[in-house]
Curated annotation (Swiss-Prot):
Cited PANTHER family: UPF0145 PROTEIN YBJQ (PTHR34068:SF1)
UniProt cross-references to Pfam families, sorted A to Z: YbjQ_1
Protein name according to UniProt: UPF0145 protein gll1048
Domain of life of the native organism: Bacteria
Annotated organism of origin: Gloeobacter violaceus (strain ATCC 29082 / PCC 7421)
Similarity comment: Belongs to the UPF0145 family.
Stored NCBIfam families: PRK02877.1
UniProt cross-references to HAMAP family, sorted A to Z: UPF0145
Length: 108
C-alpha cells in the first residue's frame, strides 16, 4: 500500500478513485497528567514520553486509514492530511485527537 501526501504517485497513474478514507486516535487525559508528572523528562524543551505517545497515536490513525483503504480494494492513498486537535472534556481537562484522511485509489 502506497501512502502519500501528494495527489499523484510518480510512475503510477490513478486508475480509479475509491473514496475518502479516515483514521482517528485519541490521547486520553491521563496521558497529559502523566506528561506533566514526568516533566523532568523534558530535555531542550521536548518530552520524549509525550512524543512517543503522539507517534503511537499517529500510527494507530494511519493503520486505521490504511485498513479502510484495503477494504475498498485500494492499493494506494493519496492526498493524506494529518491533523491534531485538542478536545475539551467536561472535567476541565483535555484530550488530543490525531486524525488522518486521504483518498483511496487504484493505481496502475
Amino acid at each position: 500500500m502506497i501512502i502519500s501526501t501528494t495527489t499523484a504517485i510518480e510512475g503510477r497513474p490513478v486508475q480509479g478513485y475509491l473514496g475518502v478514507v479516515t483514521g482517528e486516535a485519541i490521547l486520553g487525559a491521563n496521558v497529559f497528567a502523566d506528561f506533566f508528572a514526568k516533566i523532568r523528562d523534558i530535555v531542550g524543551g521536548r518530552s520524549a514520553a509525550y512524543e512517543r505517545e503522539l507517534r503511537k497515536a499517529r500510527q494507530i490513525a494511519m493503520d486505521e486509514m490504511t485498513r479502510e483503504a484495503r477494504e475498498l480494494g485500494a492499493d494506494g492513498v493519496i492526498g493524506v492530511d494529518i491533523d491534531y486537535e485538542t478536545i475539551a472534556v467536561p472535567e476541565g481537562g483535555s484530550m488530543l485527537m490525531v486524525s488522518v484522511s486521504g483518498t483511496a485509489v487504484k493505481l496502475s
